[in-house]
Amino acid sequence: MYYFVTASKDASIYLQQPTQNTGLDEILEVSKVYYGNLKDTARSLIKFETTPLSSSIASGEVTMSNAELILRECESNEIPNEYSIYAYPISQSWDMGIGTRFDEISTDGCSWENRKTSTKWLIGSASLESSGSFNGKGGM
């Protein structure tokens, strides 16, 4: 049996654009790029509404022993032959926002610095009890 849960909200955040929001952008970015001595990092935030799934598991309607996160790549450049992507839980609520990467630039919503428009992320508040990772084979 398959049970699909799609993201209820998502956004990419950028080290070099620390207040920019991309909640309405159609692309999620994960990257680490160097421009000379300048490092730019992009991370993706993805929220899944899991309450219905939790209820279905508790009632016995859904039984499962594992889960998969399926992401697709597009416009990849200079991917190394081997790489790892890690997933961590976010311990704070965040606003998806209304911005896009290049067309509708906005600072409303989450960003590298803020989890909501004017609310900073709390540093060191995450629980690293659970995580996920992917070790992929890349290259073009």
Describe each model-derived feature in a short phrase:
Residues 1-140:
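Secreted, disulfide-rich extracellular signaling modules
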